[in-house]
Amino acid sequence: MFNLFPPFGANTAIFNDAPQPWQVGFQDGASPTQEGITELHDSIFFYLVIICFGVLWVLSSVIVNFNSNKSQLVYKYANHGTLIELIWTITPALVLIAIAFPSFKLLYLMDEVISPSMTVKVAGHQWYWSAEYSDFINEDGESIEFDSYMVPETDLEDGQLRLLEVDNRMVVPIDTHIRFIVTGADVIHDFAVPSLGLKIDAVPGRLNQTSVLIEREGVFYGQCSEICGVYHGFMPIAIEAVTPEKYLAWIDSQA
C-alpha cells in the first residue's frame, strides 16, 4: 500500500479488485457493465444446472427402464411420441429465448457511449500502453500524455503486484462517464480490465471506443488480451479510480 498523493497525507490506494491466487470466478465488479455480466453469467449458469440434471435424469431413466437385458420387447415400441417431440423442441427454444434477450440487452448497453464527461485515448505498443487526456491542457498548451510500462520484479515495493504493477497508472474519477478511445500503434492488442467489464481491441489504423462508469475508488488491473509478440504477458494495465477532488489534484500535478 502506498499514497497516491504523498503531499496530501493519508490518501491510500485500495487494492480491493486485484486478482487472487488460484481465482476461478469473476473479480468484484466495480462498474454497471461488469455487474451486468456477472448477473447474466449467474442466470445462464442456473439454467445450465437444471438442463444438465434434467438430461442426466432422462438418460438414466432410459438406461434403466429401456434396455434389452430388462426386456427384449419394450424398447421396440418406443419409436414415436408426438408429445415428447414437442417438449424437446419447444423447451430448448424457450431456454434460448430466455438467454438471448438479456444477452442482447447487455451487448447493446456495452456498445452505447452515453454522453461522456471525459475521454482517455489509449494506444497499445509492443509492449506497453500510452494514454492521452486530450480534455486537459498543461502550461505548454499540450494535452496530458504518458507511457505506462510494467514495473520489473526487481523494482517492486511492498504491496505491489507482480506482472500487474506499472510505473504510471491511468487515473480517472469515480461516478463519471468516461470514454476510452483505443487503437494500436504496431500490432493488434486488446485493452482489458476484468473488474470494470472492459475488453476492446486495439487495432492499428482503427479507433474503437467504449465507455465505463466506475462506482467506487480502487486500483483495477488488467492485461493485454491479444497475443502481440514475445512480451505479450508483460504489458499490464492499471487504472486508479479516485474521487473527483483527488482527480483534479492529480491533473494539476501533471500540468
Curated annotation (Swiss-Prot):
Cofactor names: Cu cation
Residues the record lists as binding Mg(2+): 226
Signal peptide: 1-16
Domain of life: Eukaryota
Residue numbers on the Mitochondrial intermembrane membrane side: 17-43, 102-255
Residue intervals passing through the bilayer: 44-64, 81-101
Residues exposed to the Mitochondrial matrix side: 65-80
Note on how the cofactor is bound: Binds a dinuclear copper A center per subunit.
Main location (coarse class): mitochondrion
GO cellular component: a single term: mitochondrial inner membrane
Gene3D superfamilies: 1.10.287.90, Cupredoxins - blue copper proteins
Known catalytic reactions: 4 Fe(II)-[cytochrome c] + O2 + 8 H(+)(in) = 4 Fe(III)-[cytochrome c] + 2 H2O + 4 H(+)(out)
Gene Ontology MF: a single term: copper ion binding
Keywords, sorted A to Z: Copper, Electron transport, Magnesium, Membrane, Metal-binding, Mitochondrion, Mitochondrion inner membrane, Respiratory chain, Signal, Translocase, Transmembrane, Transmembrane helix, Transport
Compartments it resides in: Mitochondrion inner membrane
Residues engaged in binding Cu cation A2: 224, 226, 228, 232
Binding-site list for Cu cation A1: 189, 224, 228, 235
Membrane topology of this protein: Multi-pass membrane protein
GO terms under biological process: ATP synthesis coupled electron transport
EC number, as in UniProt: 7.1.1.9
Oligomeric and partner information: Component of the cytochrome c oxidase (complex IV, CIV), a multisubunit enzyme composed of a catalytic core of 3 subunits and several supernumerary subunits. The complex exists as a monomer or a dimer and forms supercomplexes (SCs) in the inner mitochondrial membrane with ubiquinol-cytochrome c oxidoreductase (cytochrome b-c1 complex, complex III, CIII).
Role description: Component of the cytochrome c oxidase, the last enzyme in the mitochondrial electron transport chain which drives oxidative phosphorylation. The respiratory chain contains 3 multisubunit complexes succinate dehydrogenase (complex II, CII), ubiquinol-cytochrome c oxidoreductase (cytochrome b-c1 complex, complex III, CIII) and cytochrome c oxidase (complex IV, CIV), that cooperate to transfer electrons derived from NADH and succinate to molecular oxygen, creating an electrochemical gradient over the inner membrane that drives transmembrane transport and the ATP synthase.
Name the record gives this protein: Cytochrome c oxidase subunit 2
Native source organism of the sequence: Mycosarcoma maydis
